[in-house]
């Protein structure tokens, strides 16, 4: 059987059995006779299951249609490429962060580079930002007294520019050189009313889930599931979202909807929604063409998610997206699911507390027998788990979805509720992405998870105590439920305990040819040892010497060619970039492939610095793109305990 047909049949079976299960739950299991509280709690549990399942149904339907809307990039002659305005939005980000993004934009490939107009859009009117723009030869658009956050900044830029296409980048998002060449042609197909092309959000540093849980080699970035999977699937209903950066937009379409919208803290999401209502296609492509920074503190991550939650709800209410006839039924369903997604965190809390209420306090939330429950629930649950795997190309599974929801749930329930009843947040606060050394622990955020963990453990002990034989069998569903929740809570505790960050800049695995010469030397005519990098960063480099090099200086088989503290010069040469660096050896070590030399580096000139940054960032990042399929809960828990006791985490003394 073809993989797509097999997947679709599993989806159909999952929808069928889940529908039967939900019908049974609604009409046959609510404890109406056990009192008002238990009946209300039972209804909440059923509603939580319905919300979660409907979200899955929408994703399954979109996945079954997704292949129909993966568009081929049109082949367009170079002379047809139009002018493009590149907007880089900044508010208060440091100049060294902006430097990397602006620098990368100056290297963007285009048939006629005179048609690419780059602007640093600064709503802080900072002198350092203006000087940076002048230094790198790009335009500067300052805005004082901005009352409309990012929308106001971009609308000001729109008023001072005129190109038919606009590319937008956040301050930390570094585009690859081919970004425009792989997005602009979509707008040049006369048969397609293209309004916006969104490329995936990608990140070159570890996100907090990867970092705090010591999983940087085992799981992809948490946002990959939406950017690379969900948003692409929503091409099927023309509901792909603008995520604020790494995007190209048609100016005339923006002007038709009145520019970037006000009255929401997620102007990007509402922009794409308004474009869709006006009949334009918003397309989410699949190739990563830019990368930026994930949030580096729990507080900033939570603040970011609260803003997303409130903004999506605001925008859906502002545009009447769920009920408007200006969108197709499939689009309205997608926005209903987008709205309900933010309620899934309340659902997660209900799923955690429901077995606790039963096992610890004796409150019955489901009225049924054991075998009846098993007959209706088990097929639905198993097919649900299998379907999650087929929804994603191994980017997300049911376990990691539960872990992420458990970590975020306590902090999103109240903002989602308040926003839904009309208590709005209008103030925009820029997400802090500054990399810091030191611990990432946030013990005050640990309190809700600590309480839930204690309640779940107490429930497990009380409910299983003194049971054996068939009594344990009849209790197995509740015990499974408690253990399942316990897993997510243990991960949440580890997450909040944090981990010590020892580096200010990210190391990116890369194999790039280098030429090295020990001691002082002139740049011209450098002739020395050849090597290949292992990894690169803004402050350092690790490399191996090529085989067959002259190593007479070695006194024994595995002794280093260069000694610690020795200074030398490195030339790095790629197909597109060339940089010369002063280097100082920090250490060397032996592994199974030979000796690795690690050195701190400093570019010689401004041109070397600009090229060195491109050598580092103009590539696909080296962090995982898929889950490690063999990784288990036992592996993760064991690793977290071992590394924290070893001194890698917050337990270090």
Model regions and ranges:
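Short, acidic, metal-binding catalytic loop of nucleotide-sugar glycosyltransferases
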Residues: 103-115
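Cell-envelope/extracellular polymer assembly enzymes that use nucleotide-activated donors
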Residues: 83-87, 117, 270
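The conserved acidic donor/metal-binding loop of glycosyltransferases
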Residues: 170-174
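Long helical/loop segments within the catalytic core of UDP-sugar-dependent glycosyltransferases
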Residues: 142-165, 177-265, 276-277, 298-340
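N-terminal membrane-anchoring/stem segments of glycan-assembly enzymes
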Residues: 1-80, 133, 345, 468-497, ...
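Membrane-embedded multi-pass helical conduit in multi-pass membrane proteins
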Residues: 21-50, 76, 341-426, 442-499, ...
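A conserved acidic beta->alpha catalytic loop
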Residues: 121-129, 146
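Structured alpha-helical
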Residues: 440-653
